[in-house]
């Protein structure tokens, strides 16, 4: 299941399906070629299938430790501030579509479509729409930087982004569509087969965590994930490091530790 490109739920035309498949394949390939040097020097010991010990309500059921400071925390706080600032633009779009910038209107339309649905259908609509609207592109090609986290409206204005940009856009869209931030997590994971890193959104529905990934249209539960090992969890209250049964070097726990998500 880990690397199969699954078809979209619902009806699609052959042209739409072909485009979507090519886009996902390209996004999947792009993410494989960005291994953070900080982690590459000290890889994690991991399994293909993630176990879920009892006693945790977070994705993957693993124990976590809060990360208080460091570049990753600063980067996430900055993105949250930008998401909050962009709510003003979305409010303008809600009051007058004619006054809404075109690319902002695209993002707002995804939110509106999500609001019309509930539960899994809402998650699926936003997952598919964001996956199709954003072209996969590395930070280097898009911004001229090795690591740049883009706010949702910036990503939509560019029409392109890497895996954490997809996850950030879905995080913001689901919040605006009515999903509590308590039920949303951005997960930074290690691809244990390709030895690279990736980011995806986890959304909780009726006590179960669904993975919204730019590599696939179909959402799967965290317990079904294969080929990934979770490392960091980003949520409204901050960042946590998955510890559980993982063996991570002491350098990973230092405040200055920095992870760059894959493209």
Where do the PLM segments sit?
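A structural boundary/capping signal
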Residues: 2-9, 14, 37-263
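Acidic, Ala/Val/Gly-enriched low-complexity intrinsically disordered segments
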Residues: 15, 20-23
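Bacterial N-terminal signal peptides
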Residues: 23-34
């Amino acid at each position: 299941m880990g690397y199969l490109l699954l078809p979209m739920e619902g009806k699609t035309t052959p042209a739409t399906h072909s485009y979507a498949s090519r886009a996902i394949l390209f996004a999947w390939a792009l993410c494989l070629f960005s291994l953070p040097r900080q982690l590459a020097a000290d890889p994690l010991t991991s399994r293909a299938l993630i176990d879920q010990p009892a006693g945790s309500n977070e994705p993957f059921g693993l124990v976590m430790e809060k990360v208080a400071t460091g570049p990753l925390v600063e980067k996430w706080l900055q993105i949250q501030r930008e998401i909050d600032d962009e709510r003003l633009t979305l409010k303008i779009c809600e009051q007058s579509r004619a006054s809404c910038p075109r690319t902002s209107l695209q993002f707002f339309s995804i939110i509106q479509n999500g609001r019309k649905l509930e539960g899994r259908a809402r998650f699926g609509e936003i997952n598919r729409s964001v996956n199709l609207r954003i072209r996969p592109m590395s930070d280097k090609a898009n911004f001229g930087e090795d690591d740049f986290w883009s706010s949702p409206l910036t990503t939509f204005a560019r029409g392109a982004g890497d895996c954490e940009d997809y996850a950030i856009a879905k995080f913001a869209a689901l919040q605006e569509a009515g999903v509590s931030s308590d039920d949303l997590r951005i997960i930074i994971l290690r691809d244990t087969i390709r030895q690279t890193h990736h980011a995806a959104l986890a959304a909780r529905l009726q006590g179960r965590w669904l993975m919204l990934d730019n590599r696939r249209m179909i959402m799967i539960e965290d317990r079904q994930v294969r080929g990934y090992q979770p490392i960091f969890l980003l949520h409204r209250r901050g960042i946590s490091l998955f510890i559980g049964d993982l063996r991570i070097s002491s350098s990973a726990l230092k405040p200055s530790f920095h992870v760059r998500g894959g493209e």
